[in-house]
């Protein structure tokens, strides 16, 4: 059974296409820039870009805001806090924190697809304080500890 989520189009986003999957096999719904006219991201600059939407997700789900691969690969534009998390109980406007990692200015126009929103299941656990935790072969090996081969 397919889950349903409610979407609220804010006044500054009513004329934009609602998020949708670009193809039958897509994992992410495309989010669009709900800005007036255009904006320019200078190299190294980041900006919160409004999408003009609010969502109400069913319990047990979250929305992850992820970069669009084409923007990252071709222009160095990505989501700064990737993946951004939209909690199930958040009801405000979804905004995307875009950053320009390239050496060139990048212009975002109204209606441009700027990120993708992936809906995922969430599990919550109860943390119990302990005096010790179990041993593993890896132990406390951290970044790069398992090698590259």
UniProtKB/Swiss-Prot annotation:
Pfam families in the record: dUTPase
Binding site for substrate: 68-70, 81, 85-87, 95
Record keyword Hydrolase present: yes
CC cofactor: Mg(2+)
EC number: 3.6.1.23
Pathway(s) per entry: Pyrimidine metabolism; dUMP biosynthesis; dUMP from dCTP (dUTP route): step 2/2
Matching InterPro entries: dUTPase (IPR008181), dUTPase-like (IPR029054), dUTPase-like_sf (IPR036157), dUTPase_trimeric (IPR033704)
Entry annotated with the keyword Ligase: no
Catalytic activities: dUTP + H2O = dUMP + diphosphate + H(+)
Keywords tagged on the record: Hydrolase, Magnesium, Metal-binding, Nucleotide metabolism
GO biological process assignments: dUMP biosynthetic process; dUTP catabolic process
GO molecular function: dUTP diphosphatase activity; magnesium ion binding
Function, as annotated: This enzyme is involved in nucleotide metabolism: it produces dUMP, the immediate precursor of thymidine nucleotides and it decreases the intracellular concentration of dUTP so that uracil cannot be incorporated into DNA.
Protein family: Belongs to the dUTPase family.
NCBIfam families: dut, PRK00601.1
Protein name: Deoxyuridine 5'-triphosphate nucleotidohydrolase
